[in-house]
């Protein structure tokens, strides 16, 4: 491709039982992105979707912490360096975002919150976040709200009104701890693609824009 312009990158993860094609085949993310950029709601960006290694059903000899964790070093040590070496992207934390649906939301938490030197924007859609010790998890970052709020420029969690994944409870707990997190609700939808399409559409206008 001709040109010298460089772009920020959104790493977008699928959920359990899906693969890297989920967001394009069922989520129609390409249409969501095209419309948002064309309408001027979102800045032009590159979206990277990779297999999160969560196709097999959870519980087959894997703990909650281990399921999908094999993807973390792949993203950090292989995928990001490859993208930055082969595509015209801005290679710094200010221009990297990550988001994911369901278990991909958990992967987003695990990766971003343990690597705040690499990401500045994050979002989850119906995230599979259960039993998080807000005070101590992720090196205790949630107990240092000023540091978190400075490093993460935009943090959003969303879910549908017809699902019970504990997203609203998690948001309330984080807000009580002083964390800046935006909460988006998809009316009348459950743990399904309509919820996640809406979540992505509401997330992307808020990233890569310093306020």
Where in the sequence are the language-model features?
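Non-catalytic cap/lid and distal C-terminal segments of serine-dependent acyl enzymes
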Residues: 1-211
């Amino acid at each position: 491709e001709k040109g010298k312009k460089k772009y920020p990158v959104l790493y977008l993860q699928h959920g359990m039982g899906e693969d890297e094609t989920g967001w394009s085949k069922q989520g129609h993310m390409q249409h969501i992105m095209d419309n948002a950029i064309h309408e001027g709601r979102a800045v032009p960006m590159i979206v990277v979707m990779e297999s999160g290694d969560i196709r097999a059903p959870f519980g087959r000899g894997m703990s909650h912490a281990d399921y999908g964790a094999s993807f973390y070093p792949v993203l950090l040590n292989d995928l990001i360096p490859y993208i930055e070496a082969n595509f015209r992207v801005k290679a710094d934390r200010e221009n990297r975002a990550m988001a994911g649906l369901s278990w991909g939301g958990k992967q987003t938490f695990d990766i971003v919150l343990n690597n705040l030197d690499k990401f500045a924007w994050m979002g989850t859609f119906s995230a599979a976040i259960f039993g998080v010790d807000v005070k101590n998890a992720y090196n205790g970052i949630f107990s240092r709200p000023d540091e978190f709020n400075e490093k993460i420029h935009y943090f959003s969690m969303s879910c549908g009104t017809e699902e019970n994944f504990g997203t609203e409870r998690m948001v309330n707990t984080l807000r009580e701890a002083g964390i800046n997190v935006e909460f988006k609700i998809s009316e009348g939808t459950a743990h399904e693609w309509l919820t996640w399409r809406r979540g992505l559409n509401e997330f992307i206008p808020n990233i890569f824009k310093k306020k």
